[in-house]
């Protein structure tokens, strides 16, 4: 069993919007033999859309708004990629995805450097000590000086870096990269489809001068000497602890520098790591199966109103049609058609191992954070739901479609796209999100997937926080005094809806024994 687990590599690709994350995902799939032509992600002239952006709205907007899961084999390794939304409005989906991966590749735009979304996502990686590899993309366009970029990465992401490839110029002068890990030169040949052959040259021979010209060769030798003098030797142990990030340079769109990244990645990235539960730590090579649901997606197939629960296997082996224990429901379940994914293509899977992501058909059985085991009561930790930052009343715009609207809202909330609160004062439904774009996505999906129409009504709120107290009388007094501000979430928990920072601070001062939480573990 250990060899199956050892060959698993489960990771997420994260980035600020437009850094080239989806392009990189596609090129990795190209190398894995999963697609013949990459999706020419942005170009509308070529009417292809990125393989990993598979919801209609993603294809229209040219951005990823949900996490895609894809798996393929490469050089005896089993690769599971989670391509996450870069758009900040969908950060919560990304945060949850980071609980299901063993390592991360961060894509940084060579011209723009570190951007806000990258910083936030890196904080989540740091909290979990997730190993990180950095790919500096778009070197075939004008980019910042590589030394400046490395300084910025260290300062902004608070991590030691070590370049494993080094760029020779950028923009129209971009000649390629020198691979410090293998001591070879790879010359740049733009190619969107075919995987290019490497031109390999030893740096200390005249052949280098012949390939890129004597002035550039001299400059490259000087820069590489400086790199070795300034940056520590690459240390795999430090990388695995999340303390050092290897850096690669390239152009995902032109298929350049991606193979070096992939080859080094499968060699150094961790196989499945232990997972914490409230009861104990689960080791991946334990014989018994355990797993948790980190994501739910409605309508992978709009013809069948189906939901799929994405389950990360934490230990042991999963087998089709075997009874497993659903901890929250306290009952056993069998799964006759578990699936694995290549973006929209699903295949039924008979067995899967620790590190794999499987899709389980879901008709309302699962919530994010649910645990499956062979009988042990375990609760996996750390799948948070954050306090929303934007709020609107949701209203039915078509009285004939009340049932469809209710079902649509229910399934979309199960996905964790947004949060639903019922105002205790007037009984109205409030949707809370992290950003404006989510309201558009909800409205679009209700209309296109559920044939239901909604309207948004304005409501002025500052924060939603979950409240609890060890003193039931004080909690009751608080709820009476703040009646117009109280709501319930879908779990029936008490939520305080403050309309200003002042109201929140006064409530915290007046009620010392009430705990105000800004994240709820699902």
Language model regions located:
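Structural and coupling elements of P-loop NTPases
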Residues: 1-522
């Amino acid at each position: 069993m250990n060899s199956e687990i050892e060959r698993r590599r489960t990771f997420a690709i994260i980035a600020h919007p437009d850094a080239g994350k989806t392009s990189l995902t596609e090129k990795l799939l190209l190398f894995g033999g999963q697609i013949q032509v990459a999706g020419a992600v942005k170009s509308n002239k070529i009417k292809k859309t990125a393989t990993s952006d598979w919801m209609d709205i993603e294809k229209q907007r040219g951005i990823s708004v949900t996490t895609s899961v894809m798996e393929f084999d490469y050089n005896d390794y089993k690769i599971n990629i989670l391509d996450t939304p870069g758009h900040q409005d969908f950060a919560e989906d990304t945060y949850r995805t980071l609980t299901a991966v063993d390592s991360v590749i961060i894509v940084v735009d060579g011209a723009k450097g570190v951007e806000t979304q990258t910083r936030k996502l890196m904080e989540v990686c740091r909290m979990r000590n997730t190993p990180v590899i950095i790919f500096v993309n778009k070197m075939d366009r004008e980019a910042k000086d590589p030394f400046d970029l490395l300084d910025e990465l260290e300062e902004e992401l608070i991590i030691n870096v070590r370049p494993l490839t080094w760029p020779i110029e950028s923009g129209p002068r971009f000649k390629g990269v020198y691979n410090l890990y293998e001591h070879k030169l790879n010359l740049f040949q733009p190619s969107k489809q075919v995987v290019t052959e490497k031109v390999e040259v030893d740096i200390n021979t005249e052949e280098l001068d012949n390939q890129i010209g004597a002035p550039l060769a001299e400059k490259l030798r000087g820069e590489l000497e400086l790199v070795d003098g300034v940056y520590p030797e690459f240390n795999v142990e430090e990388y695995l602890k999340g303390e050092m990030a290897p850096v690669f340079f390239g152009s995902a769109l032109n298929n350049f520098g991606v193979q070096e990244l992939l080859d080094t990645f499968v060699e150094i990235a961790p196989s499945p790591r232990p997972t914490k539960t409230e009861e104990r730590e689960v080791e991946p090579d334990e014989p018994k199966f355990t797993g948790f649901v980190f994501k739910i997606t409605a309508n992978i197939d709009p013809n069948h109103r189906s939901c799929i629960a994405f389950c990360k296997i934490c230990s042991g082996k999963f087998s089709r049609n075997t009874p497993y224990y659903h901890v929250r429901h306290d009952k056993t379940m069998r799964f006759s058609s578990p699936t694995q994914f290549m973006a929209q293509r699903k295949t039924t899977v008979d067995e899967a191992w620790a590190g794999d992501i499987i899709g389980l058909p879901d008709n309302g059985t699962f919530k994010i954070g649910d645990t499956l085991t062979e009988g042990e009561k375990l609760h996996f930790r750390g799948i948070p739901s954050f306090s929303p930052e934007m709020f609107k009343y949701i209203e039915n715009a078509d009285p004939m479609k009340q049932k469809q609207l209710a079902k649509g809202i229910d399934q979309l909330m199960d996905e964790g796209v947004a949060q639903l609160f019922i105002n205790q004062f007037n009984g109205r439904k409030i949707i809370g999100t992290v950003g404006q774009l989510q309201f558009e996505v909800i409205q679009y999906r209700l209309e296109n997937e559920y044939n239901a129409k909604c309207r948004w009504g304005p409501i002025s709120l500052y924060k939603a926080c979950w409240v609890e107290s060890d003193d039931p009388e004080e909690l009751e007094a608080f709820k009476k005094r703040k009646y117009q501000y109280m709501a319930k979430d879908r779990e029936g928990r008490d939520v305080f809806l403050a309309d200003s920072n002042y109201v929140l601070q006064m409530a915290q001062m007046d009620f010392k024994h009430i705990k105000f939480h800004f994240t709820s573990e699902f």
